[in-house]
């Protein structure tokens, strides 16, 4: 074998092919080419690939003059389909550049005007992916790794060259199918897909879809490559290439033809193209409506429900196969996408989309299509109601004319009913709904929410006239009870949606608020006693609590009956308990609610009574929130909480960084906008109701902060005047009188700051004096205690002396008698009894 290997001189072959001469020379060239093919029939060594490629190029040039070179050229190309062979492991790396260039040359050879050559090139490329080892190997050689050729094809940008070659086989079906087959294999690589996209592969393949092909392979191969491009390359770039009217029209024609197809493969291809159409529809720039494709899809999506004849779907028959089921879901999905495009609203309205979707809003006792299984019908039902949530806000008039509110309310009534129903819960939309009706309830409420969120009076009135408030409260009560058994994201979402719907319905309508207060407050109160740890569970408790607070604001505040009922049920206490958690995202809304409630005189009384942990008062809590807010906003304060800058005492760090920007009169300045964004204005409003005097539970630092809060509105006025002054001076020079006024306002603001600083200083000095006085009192107590202890010690020492020294005892006795005698009156009283100072029979020395 080695001897044979050395007997083929490739340099000699190349030199021979470069000669052009007589007929005999041509025969000699063909003979030597056959010898080369025979020699390498078991595979090409990597070291010879570059020379074989040069021989290929020379043969291609010869072929233009002599057709006899076609066969040897094809035989040489066939060698590239065999495994390359290496002598050393390092050969794969050492010859990688030469091999990449050689494989790239295969792509360039697609320009050779020979069908046989083009087909053989494609066959060899396909062989890269189905590598079979030859019967024999060259002695001392091993085949390269299985992916070696594929990697070198990526390096040589073979896929890009093949895409460009599609233009050369435009009218040659067999060659085109082989090129597509090769591209199909190449498109399994993300790198090759990227190269194909650069060569505009998506648009070229889309135009291939509707080509004449009795076998049907053209459409399947093209769609498969398009799928790979969408998955492995830039989806945005692929969609951008398919957005031309010509491409969309071609896609539509193929889809319409496949609609009437009866083969299983036709249905599969139809669904594949429908997915591609869905991806295109997501891009507003794609002319789906202009091409008429959108109308075809909408009519097809609704034809089985509305049962109205339409020429666009003539010949289409639903077979209830799995492919038709998948198509139905894809069409529902397309309807949801079209609902986001305002220009498609008319098409959706004219083609009965609303009645088609509402067809599924009914209980599942009798499935709409007898040929769908129960699980399939349930999946379609849930999908349709989910799409209804997207379509309904776009077609409000149709929604109302079809009595959708009535259908949804009746359906929701069935959802909380006791009649037996076993849901499968297999689909995406059916999650958490196995064995119950929670999935149906969830999507029905989502549809209601989407329409109510429009704040359309006609929708709200229509709902309330049908008793929606009472019914929604019943459903909310049902969901709350179910949550006690087993809490989950679906039940939390249901409760959140109901609270939102009630908020919109009751807002600005006292009569509806009264209806809500009958049962709603009792249901609402428990939400405010939620375990704070649940807010971080990630299940949606935080959204539920915010919805409950929003519902309280919209459904209770403003109606005295509802307010009194809420306050009597300890509602203000619960709100303050929540506020004491100091959750950043809750504080603003809770303070806003308390400000609204503060118009009710009972509110301030309850706020004054409330006590939190460690006997904290409402005033202390509000002051703590104020200090934390100023810390977050970067307001400058000293270690005692006193004002540092008397000219700008409450300005935030953000405001200080802002340059002077002249604004129109209708546009609020930073000082005004800060009021709505910060909680300080709300805290100030609450203190205006609570009062600034005789507030229990406050420390000296609290009183220092309270002095700032008390003058908040004055400081704000000063801020606004400073902004006015800065804006005027930026553009103009004020006249003398205006200059005087601006200066006066600035001085007033500065004086206010100094006054507050003086008050704060007085508070601190008073506290300091009190601390000194307390310290003196404590010192006196310590001194008295020490004196007492010394006296006790002295007494104890005397006692020890008397008990251990008899002479001392006698002396003490004598002293005692002398003291007794001295204490007696000198004048004797007649018949006075004589009292002995000795205790009889006493044997102690005390």
Question: What kind of region is each of these model predictions?
Answer:
Residues 1-253, 258-272, 278-329, 337-359, ...:
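Elongated alpha-helical scaffolds that mediate protein-protein interactions in large eukaryotic proteins
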